[in-house]
Structures are given as C-alpha cells and as structure tokens.
Amino acid sequence: SYTVDAEALTDEVLDLEVASCGDDRLTNRDLPYYYWQQYYSFASTYSSYDAYLIDTTKPFDQQMCVFDDTLTWQQYFLQGAVSTYKSVSALWQDARLSGFQLGEEDQDYLDGLSNTVTVSAASYGYESADAYLQTAYGPAATMTGYHDFVERYLTASAYLQALVEAKTY
C-alpha cells in the first residue's frame, strides 16, 4: 500500500524520488497531484456509474480495480499518475528547451490561479488556499506545488497542441 499517515510525511519521505523523465524527477511531494488528477478524471468520465465501479467510502488500496483484477484501485491510479507524469514532463521539458511560451489566455489563467484558489477556499470556509488544496490533494499539498503542477500541465498541453497544429499532412 502507498497509504501513509500525515504525520509520516516528513521532508525526507516527501523528497523521495518515485519516477523520472530525462532530467526531471517526480517525488512523493508532487505525486499526489498526478494521483488525484487520475481519480478526478476517472470520476468525471464514469460519473453516471462511478458508484458501481468504486466504493469511495473504503480506502482504494483495499479494493480491486474492475478494469484489472490484478491491481487495487490505488495501484491503478498510481500507474496512471506515473504514466501521465512522464508524458507531461517530456512535453514540458521539450517546450522549455524549444523556448515555447504559453499563450496569453493560458498565462492569464496561471497568473490568476493563486487568487482563484484562495477565493474558492474562502467561499467554502477554508482558512487558506493550502488547507483547501489539502482536502483535494492530500496533507502535503500547497499552493506553490499546485501552481507548479498546473503550469506543467498547461505548458505540456499547449505545446502538444502547437506541435499538432504545426504538422502538415
């Protein structure tokens, strides 16, 4: 099981490398953003019958995945998280090396992200953006970490779109 109590999340544990792509490293500190994004994507895709596929009242490491009965749901989402990290990281690194810049709309979104999350946190009664993010991404989540995650995702997505649009057929 990958599950650990919040008290066990020391800097040493959070800084352990779990995957790499080129010169980039994924640590336990950033893995939850990718992990929970896998779950949220799954929940969105299968929202009509999500309740029949996974029991959200039980830990994911105690339920077998309906798509692959050799994996728990936790293992399934972890595999997806690492795979997504590698794809995002490869595109993000290539974008940086090529001098790619986010478009104005994406950059504006990124620039306003901290304020957007802070306002959402306050509207739901959380004392801070970090506290709000920790309910969605786990006890080590921070606004800085989330911002970095979103910046990578946006850059990778926009860069891939630019590559596709530049292709001639």
Where are these regions (language model features)?
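Short domain-boundary/entry signatures in modular proteins, especially
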Residues: 13-16, 87, 169
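Charged, solvent-exposed helices and adjacent loops that form client-binding or oligomerization surfaces
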Residues: 40-80, 84, 96-169
